[in-house]
């Protein structure tokens, strides 16, 4: 049986995924069983603005009232998820769209009451995913979690890391709009969590790259062996199957 990998697509990337991305997925499908986790921030913001519901974020997380939660669930589990499923199938990639609520796939508990109905993964029903994967489908997951009495908005990075850990995958891939981490103008092909923390402290890593590498560090601490940050608008698979981007591991490496 092929190894499994988890791929996280940020909400800001979904409308930019074109034939290049899907051809990469086609290549990966020959070697791996694939799980996709997606975000949907821009789509959610668009509906919130139309409904004149305030948008508030703290430390990169969406403050989620009951009113906001209803919109988040409607958008992520509805049009955002189904549009992505349609795009996969348009390229001949068999896909099934599901939310974390379905079959209690993503069980969640509240992260911090100050930010409302935002959750963290407490358990993943991995047998459900294994069943879908064994049927040769690509599960495309909307990161909504289910608690004892409430559904929760789960950050897509954290959901992807939780799913990757539950499936015991070796690799987690973050699809972004940048080539990876740059150091002195050159792409850092391989690095590790110690070097990442050092580069943040020295302000080598700044701006929008910080949350990307922080998400990678969280995933590594959950037991994933390596996390790669790649550019979804370009071919991100090398001739020998390596990732074209930045791969972060738990071991000690030197800059490459």
UniProtKB/Swiss-Prot annotation:
One of its GO terms (biological process) is arginine biosynthetic process via ornithine. It catalyses: N-acetyl-L-glutamate + ATP = N-acetyl-L-glutamyl 5-phosphate + ADP. Signal peptide: none annotated. CDD domains: AAK_NAGK-like. Pfam families: AA_kinase (PF00696). One of its GO terms (cellular component) is cytoplasm. Substrate binds at residues 40-41, 62, 153. Pathway: Amino-acid biosynthesis; L-arginine biosynthesis; N(2)-acetyl-L-ornithine from L-glutamate: step 2/4. SUPFAM superfamilies: Carbamate kinase-like. It is found in: Cytoplasm. Keywords: Amino-acid biosynthesis, Arginine biosynthesis, ATP-binding, Cytoplasm, Kinase, Nucleotide-binding, Transferase. Catalyzes the ATP-dependent phosphorylation of N-acetyl-L-glutamate. Belongs to the acetylglutamate kinase family. ArgB subfamily. This is Acetylglutamate kinase. It comes from Bacillus cytotoxicus (strain DSM 22905 / CIP 110041 / 391-98 / NVH 391-98). The gene is argB.
């Amino acid at each position: 049986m092929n190894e499994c990998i988890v791929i996280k697509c940020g909400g800001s990337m979904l409308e930019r995924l074109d034939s290049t991305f899907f051809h990469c997925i086609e290549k990966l499908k020959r070697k791996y069983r694939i799980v996709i986790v997606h975000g949907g921030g821009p789509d959610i913001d668009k509906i919130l603005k139309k409904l004149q519901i305030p948008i508030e974020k703290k430390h990169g997380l969406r403050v989620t009232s009951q009113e906001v939660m209803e919109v988040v669930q409607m958008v992520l589990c509805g049009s955002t998820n189904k549009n992505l499923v349609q795009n996969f199938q348009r390229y001949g990639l068999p896909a099934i769209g599901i939310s974390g609520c379905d079959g209690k796939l993503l069980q969640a508990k509240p992260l911090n009451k100050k930010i409302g109905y935002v959750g963290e993964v407490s358990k993943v029903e991995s047998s459900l995913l294994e069943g879908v994967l064994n049927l040769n489908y690509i599960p495309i997951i909307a990161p909504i979690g289910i608690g004892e009495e409430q559904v929760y908005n789960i950050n897509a990075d954290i959901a992807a890391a939780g799913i990757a850990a539950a499936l015991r995958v070796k690799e987690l891939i973050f699809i972004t709009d940048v080539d990876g981490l740059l150091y002195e103008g050159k792409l850092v092909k391989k690095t590790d969590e110690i070097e990442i923390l050092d580069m943040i402290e020295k302000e080598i890593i700044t701006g929008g790259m910080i949350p990307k590498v922080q998400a990678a560090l969280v995933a590594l601490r959950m037991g994933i062996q390596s996390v790669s940050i790649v550019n979804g608008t370009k071919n991100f698979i090398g001739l020998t199957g390596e990732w074209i981007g930045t791969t972060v591991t738990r071991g000690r490496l030197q800059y490459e």
